[in-house]
Amino acid sequence: MSGMLLESESDHEDSEISSGYSENGRLMSQDPLSLSTGNVMQSRLEQYSKRLSQLGLAATDGDSNGDGTDNDIIPSEYDEEEISVPKQEVPMTTSLILDKLPPTTNEFLHQLSIKEMEQDIEKTVHKIQIKFQPIGSIPLITPSVCTISSQQTFSMIILFLKKRLKVEQVFCYINNSFAPNPQQTIGSLWSQFKVNDELIVSYCGTVAFG
């Protein structure tokens, strides 16, 4: 009886071993297919990665795990139209720039501009020497050389002579040649007809020329 039990147990063990071999054989027969499938997936992932690199996109770890988001994809360069800044020319003398300067700087610029204006005025406005020469019997004024601003008109010289000579009428000429327009500036006449840096003005009580 015991011999029969031993044989049956042995047969059961043999059947389990044989079934294990068959199962292992079946799994081994399936391994090449699984390996082939893994190779295909790996190849596809490599192709996908190459395409991403060609498009200039960076694949993150989230993409490889399949749970990446659109925020993980960063363009390699931005659109120039989106980041372009409109250009506008602004003059340097605008008051907006001056208002943003410190008070001390504004005061310095103000004083500098006043000084420059005074220098320009000194360059354009200067004293001119007038030498008076009487014609005929009209009295000689003393001193015969006077100074006057270059911005004054010739009418001021006529008025000056009338007051000094105490006459109602006087006729004036430049270099004994012509009578200038009373509205002409002294500086203009001096620059054109000066003699030894003096403007020679002849005067008389009656019409002397023409």
Swiss-Prot record:
GO terms for molecular function: Atg8-family ligase activity; enzyme activator activity; protein tag activity. InterPro entries: Atg12 (IPR007242), Ubiquitin-like_domsf (IPR029071). One of its GO terms (biological process) is autophagosome assembly. Pfam families: APG12 (PF04110). There is a cross-link at G210 (Glycyl lysine isopeptide (Gly-Lys) (interchain with K-150 in ATG5)). Residues 60-72 have a biased composition (Low complexity). Transmembrane segments: none annotated. Residues 1-41, 58-84 are annotated as: Disordered. This is Ubiquitin-like protein ATG12.
